[in-house]
Amino acid sequence: MWREEAREQLRRGRCCFAAASVVSTAKHNKSLGNCTHGSGVMTEAEGILNNVWDAVDSKQQGFIYAKDMPDLVGRFGQFLAQSLTSRANDEAIAAFASEKPFYKLDKEQFKSTFQTLVGTSLQTAVELAGHGEPRPRLFGAIRRASATGDEQAREELERKSAELSRVRDELDEWKSKYQFLEREFLFYQTHHENSVDSTQHEFIISEMKRTIEEQTRMIGQLRRQVQGGTQVLARAGKRASPVDVFMYVSRQGLLLLMRMPKAAFLLLLLGYFVWYTVMGGAVQGPDPSVALPEPPKQPWWEQNNIISALYWYLTDTFEPSQRINDTVNDNYNSLFGL
């Protein structure tokens, strides 16, 4: 009796095991169907994304909010050998989720945002996590490779910019040469009847005239800038200050002296004469603090050096036997301190 009961229980157990196997096989086939549904073969990352996406997007809205992104990324670990991201990546994703919590993301936007925050694509991250490699080291290598690529791109951009500048300078040089040849051709075309030597000489003269005209035009512009001091201020509605007036008068005086060198020389000579007279009077002038005795009064002809010298010369010449009296002697002694 008990043997029949045991056989019945064993038969029921086998039926339950077979039913469980059938259900498991059906679920597995359904999962494979989801992975292969759509256009062609689906990648491993896309298949896992579809599974975890349905769990987060329970309302089937077709998008998730940014605040749900950490949960979505964490669910990838159920299908991989280890977590999809490192701790630094999780912090970056959490910061993005807290900064824009209600930002809507569809699957494509999620992939691009994931690549921006993590530094690698979702497919690459899934492959690395599925193989069980040390993730921080691999992701660091990926970031270093990305940084190296950015540095190379920056160097390439700088090199291209320098090359572009060099080409522009060369283009300007060729443009100036072309303009010169064009002027030469037009000149020869208009003077083809003349001889070769005379035509060349005329072309050189015309180029010199053109250069002189350009220099004259530049000098005229500078002259107008120098002469238009107060006029420019008046046109601008500004009142000229004393410093501006002084600078304007100084420029005008300098231009006048440059145009009239003789007048400048005479003015300089006159200024020197006035300075010498004033300084000489200041040096040789009498000191009012020192009282000097008044000199004896002399005749007017003795006050003139030339007339006095002539008088005494004639006197000594024509009156050699003139008698020297006591008065003359006393005057001589007092004069020379004898």
Swiss-Prot record:
Transmembrane segment boundaries: 263-283
Keyword Magnesium: no
Coiled coil: 149-228
Membrane topology, from the record: Single-pass membrane protein
Compartment list: Nucleus membrane; Cytoplasm, Cytoskeleton, Microtubule organizing center, Spindle pole body
InterPro entries, A to Z: Mps2
Keyword set includes Transmembrane: yes
GO biological process: protein localization to spindle pole body; spindle pole body duplication
Primary location group: nucleus
Keyword tags: Coiled coil, Cytoplasm, Cytoskeleton, Membrane, Nucleus, Transmembrane, Transmembrane helix
One CC-aspect GO term: cytoplasm
Pfam families with a match to the protein in the record: MPS2
Function: Component of the spindle pole body (SPB) required for insertion of the nascent SPB into the nuclear envelope and for the proper execution of spindle pole body (SPB) duplication.
UniProt family annotation: Belongs to the MPS2 family.
Protein name: Monopolar spindle protein 2
Species of the source: Eremothecium gossypii (strain ATCC 10895 / CBS 109.51 / FGSC 9923 / NRRL Y-1056)
